[in-house]
Amino acid sequence: MKLKPIYDKIVVKRMEEKEQKTPSGIIIPDTAKEKPQVGEVIAVGNGKVLNNGEIRPLAVNVGDKVLFNKYAGTEVELDGEKYLVMAEDEVLAIIE
């Protein structure tokens, strides 16, 4: 199955974080860590519909690495993989 976002929506896959340890060597389990706020754009919609009816292409593209708010988007699971579906305006920055 494949997710195809509509309008100004995008699909983002969170970047995996490396295992974290405290300075004393204690490993922090995944359940205690905050989810990363960086991800890769997997799919984009066809554009944002403006008030005059025109469609403006999105500023983000497939493959872009993006920074987003920790509460951004809706998490969905597809074929065992977790993705975020969010509006383009929830993206704070493109990381170059």
Swiss-Prot record:
GO MF annotation terms: ATP binding; metal ion binding; protein folding chaperone; protein-folding chaperone binding; unfolded protein binding
Domain of life of the native organism: Bacteria
Keywords in alphabetical order: Chaperone, Cytoplasm
GO biological process, one term: chaperone cofactor-dependent protein refolding
Keyword Cytoplasm: yes
GO cellular component: cytoplasm
SMART domains documented for this protein: Cpn10
Location in the cell: Cytoplasm
Gene3D superfamilies: GroES chaperonin
Listed InterPro entries: Chaperonin_GroES (IPR020818), Chaperonin_GroES_sf (IPR037124), GroES-like_sf (IPR011032)
Family annotation (NCBIfam families): PRK00364.1-2 (NF001527), PRK00364.2-2 (NF001531), PRK00364.2-4 (NF001533), PRK00364.2-5 (NF001534)
Function noted in UniProt: Together with the chaperonin GroEL, plays an essential role in assisting protein folding. The GroEL-GroES system forms a nano-cage that allows encapsulation of the non-native substrate proteins and provides a physical environment optimized to promote and accelerate protein folding. GroES binds to the apical surface of the GroEL ring, thereby capping the opening of the GroEL channel.
Family: Belongs to the GroES chaperonin family.
Subunit details: Heptamer of 7 subunits arranged in a ring. Interacts with the chaperonin GroEL.
Protein name (record): Co-chaperonin GroES
Organism (species): Hydrogenobaculum sp. (strain Y04AAS1)
Gene expressing this chain: groES
